[in-house]
């Protein structure tokens, strides 16, 4: 019985070991079990694979997820091929069970996040192919547990940077593919340039290991990077109000601001760490971008258009929207410029405030201890609900204030009583009635103020100090805040309108001890007003009530090129903050149109005139040369020389000088003459030599005359700058003739 059971057990084990899923092909070859499941349209890792399989091919399928436990039954796999799939997710622990894995191919997939911690169990890995994926980062210690890795392929991914020392632990690495990654060539990648120059690892296509950013270095190979001005961060921390000494207690109720300035290249990122009695608070300042500014500008324009529509269409008023209650003022606010705002100091905000700056080259930090005095009343009266009365920061109120008709806010004018509706005053003297609305007791208490604040309040009668906006600010369309002792007012000035922006530092004002308003009643908030007056003082031209949740106010209908002042004050009190500004001068539209038209006309006419002038110059013919033929009287000297050397005349004279041959006895005279000539030649008769020289001179003279005749037309031209050769020939002839005569005499 026992042998039968043992036999059955062996058969079962062999059957399980030899089973193979239906779409796959399993082959036992050279003591290795191959499972070929490629090109089978699989969407999951198949189950039921042989437990002793060593090579598993799942390439060219449609697998999207590698789930944890998918390879739990094939732990002896040494080669896993998963290329050309649709893998997007690799669950942590899916590959950690393959401790004997030597070759892993995950190329040509859609992996953007990989569980690098699984590689810690794959210490025998020799080949890792992760190319043609969507990897955006490679942790510094991701490959630290792969001492036998020889070939690493991470090309054609989305890697922007690599941490220094990423490849230091790969002692057996001989082949590395890094090309076609969008590297950001900043200070964090300088190490790669030095490492590539000194390593013995093969780096194929070094020219393709190039920068994608910044734009100035786009396309530059990493090994050709220029020297970059890199510096670690340095941090400077200051407080406002300033601390007289470290640990000096501050009075409760104050607004406290810490300014953190960090220098370094690249620009450091800031982080606030607050150790307060309630625990540790970590704050990250927001990052500003040009797109956000553009959206904000568009929203501002929409607000102005809505105000204009409300003022012009008073006959068909729209119902007021139900705005949500403004959020509570936050305890801490990290600003984009590196500052930290504590709107209301109390014992809960005491502690250690640390500003930490870090960039690619390191980190630095500095701290300051803030102590709050336990005694003393708060400087500003808190509002209802335990929160300070005022607006939240601009970033917190932006969504609440958007679209409100806050150019001028509703108020009860003189002669109006409860139950007769409200009036909206845009410019003093012009009112628009609105339907009667139900108001709460708090709003009724706020409306029971001066009948017309403009008649009682005059700008310039309060604090004598003024804060004048400069000309450069008025010429700009940007909001540039001016920080004062009691608050912040930001102005955006145009030709016929001005925008006033209030920020949180001017949010908690209450009536002063000597103010007209006296002490506020319980449950009533102090009323704050904005006045727009002429710069020289006098009654307000426009005014508006400062509402909670509204931080932008538009004053319209102003005169171009006029000086105005904006006064921020509490009802019945003197002006706390006053800003003097000038509206822009309005340029007539007709003048602009004429100037632009003239400029365009000149711009279009000048090239045409230049082309016409060039055409006329090209078509104008040049002045032609004229040939002038002038007859010349024959020179008697030339005639005589020609006659003297005429061979016909010499022949006739010889006929006359010598008698006929019959008379002289035949041919003897000629022989005698020839003999005489020979004798003269032998004796060197000077007269014969002179005659030969004279004949040669005459021949040369005739040749010079023939050459002069050939150039007669050129010499006689009106525009010729050459001397007539005829005159030179005459002079030479006279000289030769004179010499000849002297010799003959």
UniProtKB/Swiss-Prot annotation:
Protein name per Swiss-Prot or TrEMBL: Immunoglobulin superfamily containing leucine-rich repeat protein 2
Stored Gene3D superfamilies: Immunoglobulins, Ribonuclease Inhibitor
GO cellular component: cell surface; plasma membrane
UniProt topological domain (Extracellular) ranges: 19-589
Task of the protein: Required for axon extension during neural development.
Main localization, broad class: membrane
Domain Ig-like: 233-371
In-chain residues carrying the UniProt-annotated modification Phosphoserine: 720
Cellular localisation: Cell membrane
Membrane topology: Single-pass membrane protein
UniProt-annotated stretches for the region Disordered: 287-326, 375-466, 656-722
Disulfide feature: 260-355
Domain annotation LRRNT: ranges: 19-51
Residues bearing attached sugar chains per UniProt: 52, 121, 337, 364, 474, 563
Native species: Homo sapiens (Human)
Upper taxonomic lineage: Eukaryota, Metazoa, Chordata, Craniata, Vertebrata
Alphabetical keyword list: Cell membrane, Developmental protein, Disulfide bond, Glycoprotein, Immunoglobulin domain, Leucine-rich repeat, Membrane, Neurogenesis, Phosphoprotein, Repeat, Signal, Transmembrane, Transmembrane helix
Ranges per topology, Cytoplasmic: 611-745
LRR repeat start and end residues: 52-73, 76-97, 100-123, 124-145, 148-169
């Amino acid at each position: 019985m026992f042998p039968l059971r043992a036999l059955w057990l062996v058969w079962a084990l062999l059957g399980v070991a030899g089973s193979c899923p239906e779409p796959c092909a399993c082959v036992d070859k050279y003591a290795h079990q191959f499972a070929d499941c490629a090109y089978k349209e699989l969407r999951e890792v198949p189950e039921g694979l042989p437990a002793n399989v060593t090579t598993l091919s799942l390439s060219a399928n449609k697998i999207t997820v590698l789930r944890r436990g998918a390879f739990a039954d094939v732990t002896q796999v040494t080669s896993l091929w998963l290329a050309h799939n649709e893998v997007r997710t690799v669950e942590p622990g899916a590959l950690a069970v393959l401790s004997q894995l030597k070759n892993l191919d995950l190329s040509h997939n859609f992996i953007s996040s990989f569980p690098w911690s699984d590689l810690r169990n794959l210490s025998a890995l020799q080949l890792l192919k992760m190319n043609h994926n969507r990897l955006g980062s490679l942790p510094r210690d991701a490959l630290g547990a792969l001492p036998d890795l020889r070939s690493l392929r991470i090309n054609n991914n989305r890697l922007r940077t690599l941490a220094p020392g990423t490849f230091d632990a790969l002692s057996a690495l001989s082949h590395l593919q890094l090309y076609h990654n969008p590297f950001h060539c900043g200070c964090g990648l300088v190490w790669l340039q030095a490492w590539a120059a000194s390593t013995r690892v093969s780096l194929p296509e070094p020219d393709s290991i190039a920068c994608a950013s910044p734009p100035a270095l786009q396309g530059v190979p990493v090994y050709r990077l220029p020297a970059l001005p890199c510096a670690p961060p340095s941090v400077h921390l200051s407080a406002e109000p300033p601390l007289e000494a470290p640990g000096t207690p501050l009075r409760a109720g104050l607004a406290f601001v810490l300014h953190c300035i960090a220098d370094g290249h690249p620009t450091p990122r800031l982080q606030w760490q607050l150790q307060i009695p309630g625990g540790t608070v970590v704050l990250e300042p927001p990052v500003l971008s040009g797109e956000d500014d553009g959206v904000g500008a568009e929203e501002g324009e929409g607000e102005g258009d809505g105000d204009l529509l409300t003022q012009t269409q008073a006959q068909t008023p729209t119902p007021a929207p139900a705005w949500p209650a403004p959020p509570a003022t936050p305890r801490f606010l990290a600003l984009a410029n590196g500052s930290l705002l504590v709107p209301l100091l109390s014992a809960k905000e005491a502690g250690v405030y640390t500003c930490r700056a870090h960039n690619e080259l390191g980190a630095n930090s500095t701290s300051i201890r803030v102590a709050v005095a336990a005694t003393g009343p708060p400087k500003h009266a808190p509002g209802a609900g335990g929160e300070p009365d005022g607006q939240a920061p601009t970033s917190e109120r932006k969504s609440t204030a958007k679209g409100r008709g806050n150019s001028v806010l509703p108020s009860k004018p003189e002669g109006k009583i409860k139950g007769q509706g409200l009036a909206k005053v845009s410019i003093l003297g012009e009112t628009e009635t609105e339907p009667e609305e139900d108001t709460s007791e708090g709003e009724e208490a706020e409306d029971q103020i001066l009948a017309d604040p403009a008649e009682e309040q005059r700008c310039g009668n309060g604090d004598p100090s003024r804060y004048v906006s400069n000309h450069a600010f008025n010429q700009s369309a940007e909001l540039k805040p001016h920080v004062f002792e009691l608050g912040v007012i930001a102005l955006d000035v145009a030709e016929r309108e001005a925008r006033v922006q209030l920020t949180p530092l001017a949010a908690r004002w209450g009536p002063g001890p000597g103010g007209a308003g006296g002490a506020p009643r319980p449950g009533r908030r102090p009323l704050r007003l904005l006045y727009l007056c002429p710069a020289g003082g006098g009654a307000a031209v426009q005014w508006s009530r400062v509402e909670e949740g509204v931080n932008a106010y538009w004053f319209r209908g102003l005169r171009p090129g006029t000086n105005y002042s904006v006064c921020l004050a509490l009802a019945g009190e003197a002006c706390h903050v006053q800003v003097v500004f000038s509206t822009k001068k309005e340029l007539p539209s007709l003048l602009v149109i004429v100037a632009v038209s003239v400029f365009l006309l000149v711009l279009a006419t000048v090239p045409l005139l230049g082309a016409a002038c060039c055409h006329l110059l090209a078509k104008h013919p040049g002045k032609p040369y004229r040939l002038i033929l002038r007859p010349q009287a024959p020179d008697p000297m030339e005639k005589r020389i020609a006659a003297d050397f005429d061979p016909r005349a010499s022949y006739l004279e010889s006929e006359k000088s010598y008698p006929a041959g019959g008379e002289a006895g035949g041919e003897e005279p000629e022989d005698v003459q020839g003999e005489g000539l020979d004798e003269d030649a032998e004796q060197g008769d000077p007269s014969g030599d002179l005659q030969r020289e004279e004949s040669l001179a005459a021949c040369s003279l005739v040749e010079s005359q023939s050459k002069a005749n050939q150039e007669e037309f050129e010499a006689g031209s009106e525009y010729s700058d050459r001397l007539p050769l005829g005159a030179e020939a005459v002079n030479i002839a006279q000289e030769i003739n004179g010499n000849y005569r002297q010799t003959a005499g």
